[in-house]
Amino acid sequence: LIVKMLMRRVKFFRTEWFRKREAAIFMLGAAILFVIVIGIARNASSTSHFFTMAAGLLIEFALLLIAVLTSLLIRHSSKQINYGMRIYTPIMLMGLLVITFRIIFIPNSLIALVFPPLLVVFGFWQWASIHRNGPKVPKSDNSYAIASFVVTAITFAISIVGYSLLGLQVYIWWIFQLTVLQLIVACDDLLKQYRHKRVDILVRAYRLKHQNDVGKDKGSFILVTWLYDLVEMVLIPVLYLLSIPFCLYMASEVFDLTEICMDMFFYPFFNYEY
């Protein structure tokens, strides 16, 4: 009711930009509202350990969904946004099922029975989604969707040989990894927009002001591009690298395996004595 009233009275909600992104924006708003409501309920009933655990996992998933939707809204045009949502739907729904397995403490024997068929169903869905929507989204999203299909196939292979819990861990790690990659790519896209709108203008102004002192190489404009170059060449690659251990830790936290994860991080694999 509130949304309908806003759409009638606020001009922004009647613009073409909003209408073509309406589904993604509504989903984003619903996810944010869900996080707020569940967060308040979690703090209000802190005596129930089960509810606290379940609410925490659901909030984590909602935050992942918020990150993916935000990235799509930043990077995709009005013609691409719906296709982008469809191409990520299978992997996110399967991730919700995996988190549900953790919340309800489904027995290991039942996981071994149910998980592989679910992977087959969602794997075919992912492949069909890539085939239908892949050509209509940016290449990076198509690549991530293909990687999601490959991870699904690897998880199925792990599960079918009897390591279903390891398969769950691998799958939930990829969902965290995919989400962080989406955020980094979105930041990189915003950085490129900043370059076109601001840095290129500064470079042209600097070139006109110092015509006799500036060469043709890129390093000649370091005084005006140093911050952009620092973020683009150093910070973004470092974020990609650090995202791997971070996502491994977050995935291990879902299944209370953080102690094992930290032991692996700090294990002296190369311990040479002179």
For the regions a protein language model found, what residue spans apply to each?
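Hydrophobic/aromatic interaction determinants used to assemble and anchor large protein complexes
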Residues: 1-274
